[in-house]
A protein has these predicted regions:
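Aromatic-lined, polymer-binding surfaces characteristic
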Residues: 9-225
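Low-complexity, Ser/Thr/Pro/Gly-enriched N-terminal "stalk/linker" regions
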Residues: 1-2
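C-terminal, helix-dominated tail/subdomain
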Residues: 209-265
Length: 265
């Protein structure tokens, strides 16, 4: 890690998580083990790299990451990679899984929740009512499901203290959306957060169906998708907050539409 957003190394780590995500899905769809091997090899390489990393050297953020200049990007990396790991889990030996989890996923999840050394700003972010916290809780919860770590899942759902009173994914669903599904940070960030909201909810539905997560708060996630689409003109989202140019073709929205259509065709 040497650069910030847009830098060569930063973009390579982004390309890596996209590649792992898509290869994991490709393995599930085709059964071709070359896709699983690609993911497994890359995870083993990251498991060697990650323990050697301190805070990112750029020091541009009060919540610096290790692979990336800010922890937010670390959370995004883990959301994608958790899917890839789950998709190829049974192709790895128990020894491979133990090494990857011990050296990569456990320390990364712990870092996202609590930081390290003298900097524990990540704990505040993890429990915040903010899009960064949505990515963080989704990342920790999804890798928790993949590793069968109930403690991680509980913290992701109900905050660091496990009560749901300070933070967590459920509290975010209560506080970040109006009853109609409008997001407190505007359309641009609603677009950014919709995928971790929906894909983590899909995991919760699969693993903890009694929570009935897609029905929670009168189906607030479906309402959020509907309002997000309405917050556009000629295919482009309204420029509220510090918005950049994004529209209905954004990959986060495409994934969210697919998942929620499957929930309620």
């Amino acid at each position: 890690p040497v650069d910030g957003g847009g830098g060569v190394v930063h973009e390579q780590h982004k390309s890596n998580y996209y590649a792992m995500f898509h290869c994991g899905v490709a393995y599930q769809l085709t059964g071709d083990k070359k896709y699983a091997a690609y993911v497994g090899d890359m995870l083993e390489a990251y498991a060697k790299l990650y323990p050697t990393l301190g805070f990112h050297p750029l020091q541009l953020s009060p919540v610096p990451g290790r692979l990336f200049w800010q922890t937010l990007n670390e959370s995004v990396w883990l959301v994608h990679t958790a899917v890839a790991y789950d998709c190829i889990y049974n192709t790895l030996s128990s020894k491979q899984r133990a090494t990857i989890e011990k050296n990569l996923f456990v320390p990364m999840a712990d870092f996202i929740m609590d930081g390290m050394g003298d900097n524990h700003a990540n704990n505040k972010t993890f429990n915040k009512m903010h899009n960064h916290a949505t990515w963080a809780t989704a990342a920790v919860g999804m890798i928790g499901f993949a590793m069968n770590r109930e403690d991680y899942v509980k913290k992701a759902l109900y905050g660091s203290d496990g009560t749901g009173k300070r933070g967590g994914f459920i509290r975010q669903m209560d506080y970040l959306f109006s009853p109609d599904g409008y997001f407190t940070e505007g359309a641009y960030y609603q677009r950014y957060a919709i995928w971790p909201f929906v894909i983590f909810a899909q995991c919760i539905e699969n693993k903890l169906p009694d929570l009935k997560i897609f029905n929670y708060r009168d189906s607030i996630l479906s309402k959020a998708l509907s309002t997000l689409i309405q917050l556009s003109y000629e295919g482009e989202f309204f420029h509220i907050n510090d918005a950049l140019l994004k529209g209905l073709s954004a990959q986060e929205l495409v994934y969210a539409v697919d998942i929620l259509y499957n929930v309620n065709p």
